[in-house]
Each structure stands twice: as C-alpha cells, then as structure tokens.
C-alpha cells in the first residue's frame, strides 16, 4: 500500500502522489489507491475521446439530395419545403464542423452565422413530421415545444429555458450532444402581438415571449434548471450553449395570406378578382410570396424575424397526396392497420375507392393528414372489436360504402382445414 512517512498513518494516491489529507476521497484497490481528482481527470479524458468518436465527419454528413430522398420515404408532397429544409440543415451542420476545423487550423476562420428556420402552413400538412424525420435521419437529439405554454420570466407559465431542458432530456443529459440538437417550436403564430404597433402594456404571452426567445435563438450560454420549473437561487443549473442548436419554429399563420395579397395587389372578391376553383385555392402556396413586412404586420417583432432567415412553406394536401399518405410511406396507416390485423391472423384490404373516400372526409373535416387516423379508427372499430374473438375470418375488405355510409366491411370467411372437415364428417 502506498503510504507517506515512517508512521504509516497517511495513505497517498498511487497516481498523483497526493496524501489523504490533500484530497476529498481516496478509494482503495488491491494494493493501490486513487483519489477523486484523478478519477475526475480520467472521466474527462474518456468523455473527450467519446465525443470525438461521436462527431459526424463532413464526408459522412448527408448531402441535400440525400436528405430530400430520405424525407421522400416518410413525407408525401411538400417538395419545396423538403428542398429548403435539406439545404438549411446541411449548411447548419457544415457550419458546426467548419467551426471545429477552424479551431484546429492556423488559418483564421470565417465566422458563419446560424440560419434558423420558420415554417408556415396549415395544420395537418406535415410541418412537425418533417422536423421529426430530419432529426431521425441525422441521429441528433430532438425536442418539441409549444409556444402557447410559454410566458415571460416572472409570470405564471413556462420559462423559455424549459425548452432547452426538453432537449437535454432527449440527449439523456449529455449537454455536449444536446448542443448540436434540433428544437421544434410549434404554434409560434399564437405568440404574435395583438397589434402591429409596439404595446404600451406588457404582453407576457405574446411579444414578451418573442423577446425572451431572442437570445437562445441567436446563441447564448443559458442556465437551465435541471428539474424544470422556475429558477431559484439555491439550485444548481445546467449550462448549455445554444449557438449550434438548430431552431425550427412553425405555425399555421391563419390570416397571413390576406396580408400578403393586400401587399401584392391580388384580390379574392369583387370585380377584378382572380377566378379559381376551390381545389386550386386549397392547394395554392399562399405563403410563397411572404416578406418580413408581412410577418411584422401579422404580429411578429422585427428582431424575432431577423433570427429566422430561412422560410419554408407547406401547402394544403389534395386528395391524391392524402391517398398516397395512407398507403405509400414506410409507416403508412394502411400498413400499420394491416399489421394489426395480421397479428390476429386476418388479412385486411382497402379498395382504391375506400382510400379516396377516407381522403375526401379528411379534406371536408379540414384536419389534413392528422385527421386520417381518426377516420380509419371510426371505420375499423366494429371489426377490430369482433375479430379477435372469432376464428372463422380470413379477410376483411373495406369499401367506399364502408367509409361513406357506415356499412360494415365485407368479411371473407376462412375455409375450414382438412382436419376440421374430417371432424365435421365424423
């Protein structure tokens, strides 16, 4: 055992040589001792090596074309939004790696500014799903926050730092990994200020939240309460740098299209109005011509808009797109329900007319792709209730009448096996 002095009373660390009086703890092994300081140093070395191993190299970073192709496998339509997101995400992570290379090289690096993303478009068109799919592809921590739950510091509600806590939790409290994650803030249009002019009175859930978000959007060293909730002076904080966190903020922005049309001179009613069918109006990209001045008029403050330089818009899905969503993606609803029925030994089939009827109902309800599952549940509920208790069903066929007129699906009976036929004849 490592000892100091002739008395043999003091033990010392076998690695750094410090005595037990110079360190907080000394841990004994078979014939050796190690102090808490040496343990901390070992942990730091291991963490650095693991972080270097986990960093995605630039040649491994998927190119914009590859990102878009990956999104195609999960999200139907929205081609413009996919291209915009693919380029923005590629440039964002290229910027992070450029910063790391710049620290290692002797040449003075060019500082690349962060490009957060603003997504505009109606509900149920794939805004959230696009962001989730991106995070899955890149294997980075991903967190979703609701802007309507946020309030300015000091008021009842969530602080903006709680958004960062969700990201840290998604990274299993690995702060270094969380610092390169993606945060998706939904319903951002609901925190627009009530009027175009700056408010004299305090708007704690609107303009106040926009002001509070500015620093973390731009990049700052934030102090996050580890258990969430409000900050108090006696708790320890998690420090996280948001410089390399990609923020995607999204909202439906109902009424913004009218502001855009007023500016560019398009008329929807009266003499000189552009005559278009309802289908054309529904699938038009109303936000294609959006400008910062339109967003300011809607109620976003200029500083907030300035931190969201990339704008991607999604459009209402037409019937053809909704039918494809039902059957084509890797996690399509038809595939999900087919698998559920297969687990009970029953084949499930949808006719093309039935899929079109489901899509038509989703369009009439105005819920977009998000409403497809609710309609499928309503249609399949009677058979999902009965079939697990029956062993005489081979196949269930869902037709147009099943969806439109609430007629029960067609049930194809299972042919008895040879053993069953022999038992009956006996």
Swiss-Prot record:
The keyword Metal-binding is assigned to this record: yes
GO cellular component assignments: HslUV protease complex
Any GO MF annotation of the entry: ATP-dependent protein folding chaperone
Pfam entry (one): zf-C4_ClpX
Role summary: ATP-dependent specificity component of the Clp protease. It directs the protease to specific substrates. Can perform chaperone functions in the absence of ClpP.
GO BP: cell division; proteolysis involved in protein catabolic process
Protein name as annotated: ATP-dependent Clp protease ATP-binding subunit ClpX
Entry's family note: Belongs to the ClpX chaperone family.
Organism in which the protein naturally occurs: Mycobacterium leprae (strain TN)
Domain spans labelled ClpX-type ZB: 1-54
Gene assigned in the entry: clpX
Superkingdom, taxonomy of origin: Bacteria
Transmembrane segments: none
């Amino acid at each position: 055992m490592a000892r100091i002095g002739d008395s043999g009373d003091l033990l010392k660390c076998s690695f750094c040589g410090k005595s037990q009086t110079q360190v907080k703890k000394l841990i004994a092994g078979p014939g050796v001792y190690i102090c808490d300081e040496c343990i901390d140093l070992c942990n730091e070395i291991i963490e650095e090596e693991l972080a270097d191993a986990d960093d995605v190299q630039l040649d491994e970073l998927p190119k914009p074309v590859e990102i878009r192709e990956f999104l195609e496998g999960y999200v139907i339509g929205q081609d413009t939004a996919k291209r915009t997101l693919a380029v923005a995400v590629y440039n964002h992570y290229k910027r992070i790696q450029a910063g790391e290379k710049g620290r290692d090289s002797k040449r003075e690096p060019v500082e690349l500014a962060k490009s957060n993303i603003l997504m505009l478009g109606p509900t149920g068109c794939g805004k959230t799903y696009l962001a989730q799919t991106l995070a899955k592809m890149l294997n980075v921590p991903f967190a979703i926050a609701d802007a309507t739950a946020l309030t300015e510091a000091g008021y009842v509600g969530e602080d903006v730092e709680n958004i960062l806590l969700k990201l840290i939790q998604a990274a299993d409290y690995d702060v270094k990994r969380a610092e390169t994650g993606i945060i998706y803030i939904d319903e951002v249009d609901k925190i627009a200020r009530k009027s175009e002019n700056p408010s004299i009175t305090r708007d704690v859930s609107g303009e106040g939240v926009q002001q509070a978000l500015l620093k973390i959007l731009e990049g700052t060293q934030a102090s996050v309460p580890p258990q969430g909730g409000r900050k108090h002076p006696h708790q320890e904080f998690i420090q996280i740098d948001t410089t390399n966190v990609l923020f995607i903020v999204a909202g439906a922005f109902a009424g913004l299209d009218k502001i855009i049309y007023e500016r560019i001179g398009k008329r929807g009613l009266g003499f000189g109005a552009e005559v278009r069918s309802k289908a054309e109006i529904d699938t038009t990209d109303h936000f294609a011509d959006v400008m910062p001045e339109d967003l300011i008029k809607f109620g976003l403050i200029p500083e907030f808009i300035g931190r969201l330089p990339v704008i991607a818009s999604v459009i209402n899905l037409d019937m053809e797109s909704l039918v494809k969503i039902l059957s084509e993606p890797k996690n399509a609803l038809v595939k999900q329900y087919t698998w559920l029925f297969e687990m009970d030994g029953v084949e499930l089939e949808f006719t093309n007319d039935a899929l079109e009827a489901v899509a038509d109902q989703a369009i009439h309800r105005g819920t977009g792709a998000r409403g497809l599952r609710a309609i499928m549940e309503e249609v399949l509920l009677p058979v999902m209730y009965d079939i697990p208790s029956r062993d005489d069903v081979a196949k269930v066929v869902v037709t147009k009448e099943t969806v439109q007129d609430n007629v029960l699906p067609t049930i194809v009976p299972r042919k008895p096996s040879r053993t069953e036929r022999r038992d009956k004849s006996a």
